[in-house]
Regions:
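Transmembrane signal-anchor helices characteristic of membrane glycosylation enzymes that use polyprenol
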Residues: 2-55, 222-224
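Transmembrane-helix signature of polytopic, membrane-embedded enzymes
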Residues: 30-31, 119-142
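Short hydrophobic/aromatic helix or loop-helix immediately within or flanking a transmembrane segment
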Residues: 59-67, 73-98
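Membrane-embedded helix bundles of polyisoprenyl
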Residues: 132-153, 157-164
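Membrane-interface transmembrane helices that cradle and orient dolichyl/undecaprenyl
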Residues: 160-178
């Protein structure tokens, strides 16, 4: 049994990622898609066997999924995470299988597939021919972002990557605006930080340059603005109690700034 587990944990991911790097060197379009599927599967297998520390966000997800076991599906509307019902539904379905590692495996596979597909789209649009550069980019992103920045903050990074893919698809006219808005709506039901993805549309829609500038200043300097606004609020108000932990740094700021900077 231990040999089988070793093969699944170590050998199979290495084979998948190695095969993906091999296929991406081929000069065929279908090989590019096959390669990013194989690499994403390899990363998903690693993620499946990743065990979080007790202080990690992923551990909270495991706790929620365990609480969903032996309950009806209606539990997703009054337990778990507020308003992110699509995420709660995914958690509920996985909880019924009792294979909790599927949660990070699925998000890892889909997230990295979109990330690598985005790189391929940009690569093709720029008409770059050297596949070694592409392989280097894929491996660099894996080494820099996989465990500490992706798996441990899996929902917001998944939404960021998927949103970035569809932002680029919208900019290059591969999809229409209403398709993009549907994607943003679905992503916001996984993590509310996805709503910042509509900011580029809002900036484009507002034609007045001064208003555009004021909006962007408000986004990039939202921290001191929120601090000033909070000083005017009663300390027992709902808004004060919700925003204060963010300003104090006691909760994760959901990487909204990185999403805005990217766009």
């Amino acid at each position: 049994m231990s040999n089988i587990l070793f093969g699944v944990c170590i050998i199979l991911p290495v084979l998948c990622i190695g095969s993906g790097c091999y296929f991406i060197r081929q000069e065929q379009k279908k090989c590019d898609i096959l390669s990013i599927v194989l690499i994403s599967v390899g990363l998903a297998l690693i993620a499946f066997y990743t065990l979080p520390n007790t202080s990690d966000d992923l551990q909270r997800h495991f706790d929620v999924m365990r609480s969903y076991q032996n309950h009806s599906i209606m539990v997703i509307f009054h337990s778990g995470y507020s308003l992110v019902y699509l995420n709660n539904l995914i958690m509920y379905i996985i909880a019924q299988t009792n294979i909790l590692g599927l949660y990070q495996a699925i998000f890892t596979f889909v997230g990295y597939f979109y990330l690598f597909k985005l790189i391929l789209m940009i690569y093709d649009d720029l008409k770059i021919r050297n596949k070694n550069i592409l392989i280097g980019m894929l491996l660099f992103i894996f080494c820099m972002s996989f465990y500490k920045t992706y798996i441990l903050a899996i929902r917001n990074y998944f939404c960021f990557i998927t949103g970035a893919y569809y932002c680029y698809a919208l900019r290059t006219e591969r999809i229409r605006v209403h398709h993009f808005l549907i994607v943003v709506l679905l992503l916001s039901l996984i993590h509310p930080v996805s709503l910042v993805l509509v900011i580029p549309l809002l900036v484009d829609w507002i034609k007045n340059r001064k208003i555009q500038f004021a909006l962007l200043v408000g986004i990039f300097f939202h921290y001191p603005i929120l601090k000033f606004f909070l000083s005017l609020c009663p300390k027992d108000s709902f808004v004060y109690l919700k925003i204060l932990p963010y300003l104090n740094g006691t909760i994760q700021p959901y990487n909204a700034n990185y999403m805005i900077l990217f766009m």
